Structure formats: C-alpha cells, structure tokens
Amino acid sequence: MQFVEFAEICNTIEGTSSRLATADILAEKFPLLTEEELPVFVRFMRGRLFPDWSSEKLGFGPNLLYDALAYVIGKKRSYVVSAINNAGDIGKVVESLIEKREQTMFFSEELDLLDVNARFLQMAKSSGRRSQQERLRSAQYLLSNATPLEGRYLARLMLEEMRIGVGEGVVKDAVSKAFGVPSDIVEHAHQALNDLGEVAFLAKTDPSRLSNVHITAFRPVKMMLAQQGSITSMVETHGTLAAENKYDGSRFQFHKSGGKCAIYSRRLEEMTASLPDVVKMLDKATDHDVIIDGEVIAIMNGKPMPFQTILRRIRRKHDVGDAQEAITLLPWVFDILAADGETLIDLPFRERRKILESVMNAYVAPQLVSDSAEEIEAYYHSSLDNGNEGIMLKVLDSPYLPGNRGKLWIKIKPEVDTIDLVVTAAEWGEGKRAKMFGSFLLACQDENGDLLEISRVATGIDDSMLSTLYDLFKDKIIAEKGKTVTFEPDVVFEVGYAELQKSTNYEAGYALRFPRFVRLRDDKDVSEIETLESLTRRYSLQNKEE
C-alpha cells in the first residue's frame, strides 16, 4: 500500500462521524492488505507505532518536528512555530506548509506504508550522541517526499496523536466483520495479546489461532480496573465478596520466566532498573514462572507513605542504590494472570486467588471473604486506620478482564469526588508565577478515545508543584497563542471537585464545580482517563437518577 492511500483513508474517516461507518470502511480495507501491511495499518490508524505491550518510543517530540519541517519548506524555524501557534492543529499546518513550500523538489520518492514503518523503527532504535540528528534526518526524508495530505498524517504519527476517531472498539468490530470472527473471540485475543495489529494478522492468516492465544511473559497486558460503588449495593447484588486493602501505591505487573524477571508499570513501561529491590523480593517469593498483578507501596515506621513518595523511586534513573536506602518499598500481590505457561484470566477470581497463594510464599495481599455488609464496613474502616485509601470489593466468580473498568471490581474510598483527566493546554500565570503555567485545561475521552474538554484547574497547586509541572510540560508544547499553550496530551491529573454539573461551556457537556488539583498520576496512561460514559453515570448517581 502506498502511504498516500493510507492518508486518503484517514482523511475519509476523519470526516466520518459514524462509528459504524468507520468500522465498515476499515472492514472493507483489511482483507485487501498484505499480511505484512495489515498490522502496521491497524497500529497507524490508532496513532500507534508499536504494539500496545511495547515500551518502545519514537523519541521524537514537537521541537524536532518543527526543525524537520523548517528544513523541508525552506523557512526559518520561527516561521513554522508561528504558523502552528496560529492554527493549533499541527497536522493540518504541516499539510498547508508543504502545499506552499517554495523549495520544490526536482525529484521525490513515493512513500510506501512499510517503508514509512521501517523509518519509524529506525528512528526508535537510534541511540548515542547523534541519535537526535539521525531522527531529524529521517523525519526530513519522510516530509520531503510527502504530498500535503501525507504530511498531515505523518506529522500526527510522529507525535503518536492521530485522533481521527479510530478507537479499540472500532478496530475490533472491523476485524470481526472483515474476517468473520465472532466478536467475543476477537475481544479475548486482544486481552491476551495486547496488540490489535497482531489480532488482525491472526484473523486474516489463521482465525482458529485466535481462540488459543496465551498471555506471554515480558509482553505486559493491560490491568483490570475498578469502578466506584458502595458496599451495600455490592453485597445485595453478589452476596459473598472478596474485600482487600486499596493501597495508595503504584500498580505493577511482575513477569518471571526461565530465571528472568521484569516489572512493568500501570502504563506498561518497564521499571525493572528503577525497582531492583522489589524485583528481587518477588523473585525470591516464588519458584514458578508467573505473571502477577500487584501494587508497591512506600513504608516508613510500619505505615504506608503517600503515593508521591513512590514516584520519586520510580522516576529515579541514577543512584538507585541511594534511593533504596532512603525509601523502603513493599510489594503486595493480589491476582495472577499466568502460571507455568498456563493463562489463567478466564478462571474465576476465587480459583486464581488459590493459585496465587500456592505459588507465592510471601507478599500476598490480605483478604476478607464475607457476605456481611457490616463485616466489610468494619474491614473498610480498619483499612483506613492502617493508612490505606480504602478497600477493593471483588466478585468471586469474575474473570480477569485486562483493560476493563467494569462492575466486577469496585473501589470504596472516603472521597468519591476525584477524577482522572488528561491535560491538553495551560494558561501562563501572572505576577510571580508569570514564568509558570497558572491553570490547566483538562479533558475526558469518548468511546473512541477522542478527547473532550471538561474543566480548568488552578487550585491546589503549590509553587513546588508548579515548578515540577513546568519542567514536565515545557518539552510537550505543541503550540502557543497569546497566553494559551497547547500540549501533547499524555499527562494525567487526579482532580477533586464538589459537584458535576451539566454545561455547554465544555465539549464534554459537563463541568466540574470547584475543581482542585489532587496529584499528578505519572503511573496512568491517557487511555485510563475518565470516559464520557462514566461521567454520565457519575452525574446520574450524584443526582439520584438511578
């Protein structure tokens, strides 16, 4: 497939508001692609350059894109930055500038989908002193040979921000329709493989294999998530439940196979080098090959420390030994996804728990199994007294559903008025904060993963955190116009609020009353932020409409 055809399909989809129509467009194209092209096409459509389980990064930000584009159009970098600041949509700006470029190429090569992918892989593997220069040259090559429309989507791919309305659900529907595979089999394969490109490849080449895929060591899968709820309603609905402490820690997934160990964050980024002590503890605690779900907490004088304490360890790239002495970590494990090569996610939670206890000789999280709301309530208050956030309630017959935030796991906390949102923009501050970002624009996501603005937040951010946030965001700036700065949307805030209100001022149709910054959620991926569906559910519960 020529890349221009890919760009034309993207353009068609971008102008399509119907989810079903988008799935139909993809389902029509999937069978026409070669076995090598299909997984690349699927990933690119979602703005992904690598499988979801991979922690590989392109290492290419907005600043390098500005430099590459300036070279291609024969203008100064400041001209490019000004154009982007005035327009905002970086893809469409690149399209426009390539269309108007003065430095016309006497010859150009047609871009092929697989050649573009090979360039991206080469950029990701660049290392050493000249790595940025090598990435820049690759970007210059791609943009120099691009048509204006190709340039729009190349730029978005380089920043891994496609945003054309192709979410996981749309791709799964398209795979099912294109190759006649039942949707539940596609869903199960995606849960185990965590790569829709590979799911599509198997559906095309050997659909029977989709029913027999397994979770594989060192290919992390998404973690099962929880909704908010109440003890009473859970007991009334399910009867006997498992209650566990809800730790104020950092979620992890531990993999051990053939004597090798690795640990991954909630965002599926490997953090083995940052947490060697935790890896060693878990390695010693089992003689089995395992994939385990858990949470690591910081401890001082026998009591849990705040989440931000752990972040200081996880962020540490150097002098990890000194950090180990300063901050003591303790892992708790509470679920098991695979043991000795066998995938366990389809087993009921009660059976997975028994297997977990049989393969681990330490660090298994304490648990209460009860059908008494009063007993669970007492367990909840005891957990709070011990410095935890609250408790988790889990349905004993539930499978492990990677990436699913359903009603099988429920979190019980004193405050239910916090929400995870992604930062999309900021306003420069005033007075002594003039060189810092003063307020931040926040967004939730719709069913396709497209971002919808819902609130601004400035309250609750002290000077120290403002400095931290400036350092975090300064290299993520995409555009700047007046006092408004637009960012790559990949930083998540946990935000408190007094009330959720309906509003026409924001794209989501809701607004937060008295929003306040609670904490930075480095451990969370943008895919985990609040959805429009869950906001609607929150609003209904708040107003007792359910």
From Swiss-Prot:
Magnesium keyword on record: yes
Enzyme Commission designation: 6.5.1.1
Highest taxon in the source lineage: Archaea
Gene Ontology MF: a single term: DNA binding
Record has Ubl conjugation as a keyword: no
List of residues binding ATP: 244, 251, 266, 295, 334, 405, 411
Keywords: ATP-binding, Cell cycle, Cell division, DNA damage, DNA recombination, DNA repair, DNA replication, Ligase, Magnesium, Metal-binding, Nucleotide-binding
Pfam families from the UniProt entry: DNA_ligase_A_C, DNA_ligase_A_M, DNA_ligase_A_N
Matching InterPro entries: ATP-dep_DNA_ligase (IPR050191), DNA_ligae_ATP-dep_bac/arc (IPR022865), DNA_ligase_ATP-dep (IPR000977), DNA_ligase_ATP-dep_C (IPR012309), DNA_ligase_ATP-dep_cent (IPR012310), DNA_ligase_ATP-dep_N (IPR012308), DNA_ligase_N_sf (IPR036599), NA-bd_OB-fold (IPR012340)
Active-site residues, record numbering mapped to chain: 246
Cofactor(s) the record lists: Mg(2+)
GO BP terms, alphabetized: cell division; DNA biosynthetic process; DNA recombination; DNA repair; lagging strand elongation
Catalytic activity from the UniProt record: ATP + (deoxyribonucleotide)n-3'-hydroxyl + 5'-phospho-(deoxyribonucleotide)m = (deoxyribonucleotide)n+m + AMP + diphosphate
Family the UniProt entry places it in: Belongs to the ATP-dependent DNA ligase family.
General function of this protein: DNA ligase that seals nicks in double-stranded DNA during DNA replication, DNA recombination and DNA repair.
PANTHER family attached to this UniProt entry: DNA LIGASE (PTHR45674:SF7), DNA LIGASE 1/3 FAMILY MEMBER (PTHR45674)
Designated name of the protein: DNA ligase
